[in-house]
Amino acid sequence: MAAEAARAAADASLDGWAPLVADASGCATIGDVMEDGRATAILRWYASHARDLPWRRPDAGPWAILVSEIMLQQTPVSRVLPAYEAWLARWPTPSALAAASPADAVRQWGRLGYPRRAIRLHAAARAITEEHGGRVPDSMSALLALPGVGSYTAAAVASFAFGQRHAVLDTNVRRVLARLMRGHPRAPASPTVMEVRLAESLLPAVPGLAPRWSVAVMELGALVCTADRPRCPDCPVVSACAWHRAGRPADDPALGRRRGQGYEGTDRQCRGRLLAVLRDSGGPVPAARLGAAWPDEDQRARSLASLVADGLAESLPGGRYALPR
């Protein structure tokens, strides 16, 4: 019964979707999607298969959504969940985080990866506290002015936290649209003007429905239309998918090949080792202790310098290092 009610709600809410928009580039538009039922099918699928994630719940406020969006950048949901819950338990509001030190933020971030996000989130919390009275702003311009908030994160927060009509183009959404609408196995390395125009043309005109559409396409890409081994038989729009109809052609050489980035022995691994020593210490760490964490002196010096440049560490007198104060 719940699934049937969700389907009925999805069908009813589609009545006010935008009309056909001509696209000189040849992209399919909302009129094409509605004509063959793809939009309805995706929303029905989402109503029955959406994961219960804390940042999607009705009680998740703008701050929680901002934290989740920053944590989810280049990080799997399974790793984000415990970090997200611990972070909000400690700092449930921007002002609570703003009162803490950058070192506290880095320590709490732990091994989630890409720790500059912790510094930027801390800086954003201070900006929200000092410039917006402790409330996450709801305008795109104000969101974009926050430290560490780019166009994707601003659109996601404006959409999911405030119900606004913005195209939310993450990796999953871009891959679904590339396959479904354009017949390409994947999207280009960076969003193009054509992609943005297509995504915007597909947004529902009904107030409040655009966020549901965006998260439904996002979920489809995360669970079914995955980068590797897509589960096409489980896709609600497989029969209308341009890529599937074309026989699932391989990568277009014009898009350029993506090569997986190694980790072992890289500066990134070195930085992680050194930062772990600083994070786990109760105060400044002598250079000799850092030397035990990474024996290659040149690489260690280069990585330490980059940690300092990124605001993740401070160089102190006597050859000591510490987390930022």
Residue map of PLM features:
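Short amphipathic alpha-helical interaction segments
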Residues: 294-308
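Intrinsically disordered, low-complexity segments enriched in serine/threonine/proline/glycine
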Residues: 12, 21-22
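Residues in the recognition helix of alpha-helical DNA-binding motifs
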Residues: 303-306, 320-324
